[in-house]
Amino acid sequence: EDPGTMGPGNPAPSPDSDTPSDSSKGSDSNPALLLVGNAAPPVHKKDSVVWPAWVYCTRYSDRPSSGPRTRKLKKKKSEKEDKRPRTAFTAEQLQRLKAEFQANRYITEQRRQTLAQELSLNESQIKIWFQNKRAKIKKASGMKNGLALHLMAQGLYNHSTTTVQEKEESE
């Protein structure tokens, strides 16, 4: 099945419907009829809707994927498979991690190993702490990634979505 066309899993709007907004009215509005940013609506051909290829691109790839992603059902976890509880760092551990971060925002493998032994932590706990600290600073600063800004200017990167109906009501 062509990923650009709606198939059995993704029914096209009813034949008597001329616009995408007609099919988005009602309680069972079609989530496929979302517009990203100020993108043009899909092209209607006979009884199917052809979506532009970029709609099927994932956030990790600029190539179209095979279509809408599906989730696997979560299986019930046994007690052994439960998530590890959140690490509660001691005041001493936090003080050392913060001091290390002040010296260098990116920790080397050797330094991570040494610190893990000295603080009685796993290397992965230290690695994740550093990642989270960098992410927190980045989020707080409000700085945007240069590539993201460039793509947003071209209308290719905008994670906000509105339904067709909402867009018409706001005009």
UniProtKB/Swiss-Prot annotation:
Gene Ontology biological process terms in this record: neuron differentiation; regulation of transcription by RNA polymerase II
Keyword Nucleus: yes
Pfam families per record: Engrail_1_C_sig, Homeodomain
SUPFAM superfamilies, sorted: Homeodomain-like
Signal peptide boundaries: none
Record-annotated DNA-binding residue ranges: 82-141
SMART domains: HOX
Disulfide bond positions: none
GO cellular component: nucleus
Keywords recorded for this protein, A-Z: Developmental protein, DNA-binding, Homeobox, Nucleus
Regions of compositional bias (Low complexity) in chain numbering: 15-29
GO molecular function, one term: DNA-binding transcription factor activity, RNA polymerase II-specific
The keyword Chaperone appears for this protein: no
Family indicated by similarity: Belongs to the engrailed homeobox family.
Function: Required for proper formation of the apical ectodermal ridge and correct dorsal-ventral patterning in the limb.
UniProt name for this protein: Homeobox protein engrailed-1-B
Organism encoding this protein: Xenopus laevis (African clawed frog)
Taxonomic placement: Eukaryota, Metazoa, Chordata, Craniata, Vertebrata
Gene: en1-b
